[in-house]
Amino acid sequence: MRTIGMSDYTVGEDCFTELPTALAECGAKKVAIIGGKRALAAALPGIEAALEGTDVEVLETRVYGTNSTRANIAKVVNSPACQEADVLIACGGGKALDTVKTAAIELKKIVFTVPTICSNCSAATAIAVVYNDDGSLEGYSYPNRPAHIFINPKIIAEAPAEYFWAGVGDALSKQPEVEYATSAGNLEHTAGLGLALAHTCSEPLFTYGVQGLEDVRQNLSSEAVKQIALDIVVNTGYVSNLTNQNDYYYNSSVAHAFYNATCSIPREGTYLHGEVVSLGVLVLFAYTGDTENFERYAAFNKQMGLPVTLEQ
């Protein structure tokens, strides 16, 4: 037996107005809001305005830390407010969202996500990354997918542009990685559906990526920003859930293996996840001998200022 659930999502600068309805559908009366410091500053005003005058009680607003480590996960698990809440509202980037999603496994809580940056697809996925205290990769957890995602393009446009930039780099990997991982064929229905949806992931990046990055650098909420946010969060997130099941894993391959390897060896400088993954995509095409896509993706990386060599 296989049961597939996908996150609901609301997109728009007024997305938080849907929050009371979404909570009511879950029968939720009490919430805890957890996220990064900057993320909470960006998202809380809209969330609080949406809940004003409702019977929903905010039990706690908590800064989670700075990384999705066991220590930070434990702080959420051990919070009396998070234990009492019906829904945990996770705000921030991938590390904040993954912290809350992982904590929710033990707490058995529903999670709503508010991606305040779109650096990856964590807001939609039933997988989370867990790091060691030194920043190296510990492994993965497998929470339930978030029940509802609230995507506010204005918040994303006003966040640091480097995260949007890195998010494009990470999203570039989804289509080629899934295509490579499933290349042996003989896919059952859910995996085949994931592959079909993966084919929708790259073109929006090529179409809207450069303009979207320019708009974010000007803190401008635009159609390009919205389309990139939807692609990074929803398209790639849904693909992740369809291509990652108990009996198979097609969600990533060479590009993320390249990233994981860089987390395990000494290296100079600090690099964002998607920045490294975008170079890993070129490694994938070099490995498979796909010259046409290597050249196309490398040209786009150059347009975006993403790396095309290890030196960068």
What would you call each of these model-derived segments?
Residues 16, 40-44, 70, 95-102, ...:
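Short glycine/serine/threonine-rich phosphate/pyrophosphate-binding segments
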Residues 2-3, 25-26, 80-83, 104, ...:
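Solvent-exposed alpha-helices and their adjacent loops that cap or buttress functional pockets
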Residues 188-299:
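Active-site segments that bind and position negatively charged phosphate/pyrophosphate groups
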Residues 2, 17-18, 290-312:
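C-terminal charged capping/lid subdomain of soluble metabolic enzymes
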Residues 105-198:
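A glycine/threonine-rich phosphate-anchoring loop and its flanking beta-alpha core
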Residues 1-85:
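ATP/NTP phosphate-donor binding region
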Residues 80-103, 107-116:
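A short, small-residue-rich loop immediately preceding and capping a beta-strand
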